[in-house]
UniProtKB/Swiss-Prot annotation:
Gene3D superfamilies: Bira Bifunctional Protein, Domain 2. Keywords: Amino-acid biosynthesis, Cytoplasm, Histidine biosynthesis. Its main location: cytoplasm. The gene is hisZ. Pathway: Amino-acid biosynthesis; L-histidine biosynthesis; L-histidine from 5-phospho-alpha-D-ribose 1-diphosphate: step 1/9. The lineage of its organism: Bacteria, Bacillati, Cyanobacteriota, Cyanophyceae, Synechococcales. Required for the first step of histidine biosynthesis. May allow the feedback regulation of ATP phosphoribosyltransferase activity by histidine. It is found in: Cytoplasm. The keyword Manganese does not apply. It comes from Synechococcus sp. (strain JA-3-3Ab). This is ATP phosphoribosyltransferase regulatory subunit. GO terms for cellular component: cytoplasm.
Amino acid sequence: MLWETSSLRPPTGARDFLPREVQRRERLEAQLTQVFRRYGYQRIITPTLEPLETLLAGGSIRAEAVLQLRDGEGTMLGLRPEFTASIVRAAATRLASGPLPLRLYYHGNVFRNSRREEGSYSSQEFFQSGVELIGAGGWLADAEILLLLADCVRAVGLSNWTLLLGDVSLTESLLNSVTPKAQAAVRRAIAQLDYVYLEAAPLPEAARQIGLQILGLRGQPEQVLPQLAQLPVSPERLRDLRQLCQILEAQQVRVVLDLSLLQTLAYYTGIVFQAVVGGEIIALGGRYDRLYALYSPQQLEQPGIGFTLLPDTLLRLLPPTPQDEATGCKRLVVPLVPAGIPAALALAARWRESEAVELELLDRSPEEIEAYARRCRIPEIAWVQADGSYHISPVKYPEPPDPTGHCGPR
């Protein structure tokens, strides 16, 4: 029998979301959507399944990180591991003749293979919400994205967060003097914040010192910017970074500059950033000015920048609210006798024009009906008589809500 096998469980890395969890997620998405739209962003929905080549973004994403399959014609396909590549592909083809800049937002699930041990991978499904701004370069576009991110974090109710801000172009300029072989080792140490490796690894001394120098470029803008000014980096990029920090601080965004911030995706070309709360990443993103040309039939270039929020992490960090306990249903309509069913249906239809209403469908006693309403956090019961008259009684909630969101019998 099927119930005797493991087939009834989702695969490792995937899970069911029960009604109350879905309700919290939908409320979070609605809060984010409201902020996205206030900035002029429009929703885009791209396929979950894309040609593998599209998803790899010119080699920026490792093939083994993508869940792959083959269609009936032998074409290699993949489940999207992130949204940016698919959205830029759509922008460079379907939206190429439209007005710029493009302001697009998304909500949806992504899939990745994560390495567990050498040669072993596990698949994971998780959710992302985010935006892409395509066709606008410069520090002012960077500022819009970061201020939008700040407004999103505020809208969902988190206050004690920090923006870690780096710039790939500045970090790359410091690494340019390092040989390619040593550069790979230094990058790995920087990405893992591994001071011990940098001190002990058999590296040229110049490469070691540059790696340690980059790891040391982390702190408040007023501390890091003067240090950067003494190094061989672009004065224009440094000026833009200073202006960006000033704008963010004027909006009460807590900024930590971090030149060791190297995102795992290789398509970033300018600023990169993470929003963190208590050491947990709740959002990340950056500028990708060379990605558009990979998908443009005419090989046209357009700058781009975006971020993704991590709803699963946000929901874990956000405290429960009274709204989380309610099903959303405002009233339960109960025909007391069969002759009252037509009137009960009419009442439910009328009230549903403005609110959520349930109809009692089972042959239960008044005590069982009240217990059901309590478990589901339905505030009122309308008891309908045979002649169509009714009375409404409030429901009290002495017991805690069912955490599964399921209102059936225990």
